[in-house]
Amino acid sequence: MIKVIGVRFRKTGKIYYFDPVGNDIETGQHVIVETARGVEYGHVVLGVREVEDDKVIQPLKPVIRVATPEDDQIDAENRDKEKKALAICNEKIKKHGLDMKLIDAEYTFDNNKVLFYFTADGRIDFRELVKDLASVFKVRIELRQIGVRDETKVLGGIGICGRPLCCHSYLSEFIPVSIKMAKEQNLSLNPVKISGVCGRLMCCLKNEEETYEYLNSRLPEVGDFVNTTDGCRGEVSSVNVLRQLVKVKIEVGDEKEIREYKVDELKFKPKRRRERFNVNDEELKALEALERQEGKSKFDD
């Protein structure tokens, strides 16, 4: 086991581990640390704790110091400079006629580098733009092309549920989502209905996946034959996954009757689950395209 603290450098960004070097650092404090990008000002989201060695990427870098009021002031000034940098970079993009959309600007704490994040449909030759920006800011310039998921994470928005987007509110990292999750939850497989603001499969499909997998594993399939505790045998006509109720079609004399049972009142042989949805080729291709476009955040490189 090794003692670490967890630090973020962006809101809802990835959490990185650092060595507290014996300091009693608490959640909510700010620290100065050295990263691959240089000296950075970070927000402590996980106080001192022990984690397993295999959870830590070695060598574990130490905390340089707990942030001072002067450090806080420098960070606040950097935030102001980032707004001005965005405006200047947008002007330069227009000047060079580049087909790219600027999303965010970021100063490193030591002011040795300015990073600009942008989206574009293809590759962009921005070499002349970098030279132009370097002559203005007199520091190292880095332009980084990001995807639509990163763009949405930065800008935020409201989902179809009426709540702030998960990626902008609390998700530290993008989680893999798949068509299978939508099927498991009995959702419409219309790409429009299960896509987020970014145009990719909604992150929230992952939230209830395990619950639905467990609940579905306890139920028979529609069309299966089951035995009931009251001595009847019938065909499953429908299931209610969340309430764990099953409607069974039972023959009573010359008539057929639909009765509802709790899943615990039925006996059946579990078998490999079948695909429960019929999707046309066009919709399936669209869904598979969305699934292929899932990727890791470019902010974490």
Indicate where each model-derived feature is located.
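Basic/aromatic-rich interaction segments and small domains that mediate binding to polyanionic partners
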Residues: 240-260
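Short, basic/aromatic beta-hairpin or loop at an interaction surface
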Residues: 1-15, 194-207, 253-254
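Conserved glycine-centered short motifs in functionally critical loops
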Residues: 157, 161-227, 234-237
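Acidic-enriched and Gly/Ser
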Residues: 1-191
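Short beta-strand segments
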Residues: 14-16, 40-42, 232-234, 256-261
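Intrinsically disordered, low-complexity linker and terminal regions at domain boundaries
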Residues: 258-301
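A short, compositionally biased micro-patch
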Residues: 10, 136, 229, 239-241
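A generic structural signal for residues embedded in beta-strands
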Residues: 33, 227-229
